[in-house]
Amino acid sequence: MGLHDGHRGAPVADLPQRAVGGTLVFLVIMGGIFYGGWLWAAVATAIGLGSLWEFYGLLDSKQRVSRWFGMGAGAILLGAATLKLEASAYLSVIVFIAFLVLFSEVIKRQVTGNSAALLNMGGTLAGLVYVTLPWAFMILLRSRESGKLFLLAIFLCTWSCDVAAYFTGKRFGRTLLS
């Protein structure tokens, strides 16, 4: 009957693939956390920018966002965290990107007569706040005295809850996961 036989608790065909992928991500993140420094900054930046790209892709299916302005600002925010810049640097980047997006929408309105300035700015800034800032703060957190311990606790708790939710939903969920 395909990959899933429809019974509760039935094995999932992609579970081995999920396990391998999850193990690789686990090793990369744990390696970054344990070694810290530039390695952790590189891991967090890569994951943060990849997540931001995906967020903008999901949002772009509903509304237009300034993906490249957002990605540039995300890279700057993550770089500021790597260099341990003051909080004013983060605020400056966010305000500047809001200005750039609004300015580009004003130009677009003048040229095409069509614009969704507030939706575009809101979506672009949402990606920075919801996706990029947490990764920037994790870069900063790792540089603190007990940062390694805090990050380990955050990731291990998140992963164990995620795995438990997956198997609970698989076994008892109303809509079976395939």
Language model features: what each stretch is:
Residues 2-178:
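Membrane-embedded alpha-helical bundles of polytopic integral membrane proteins
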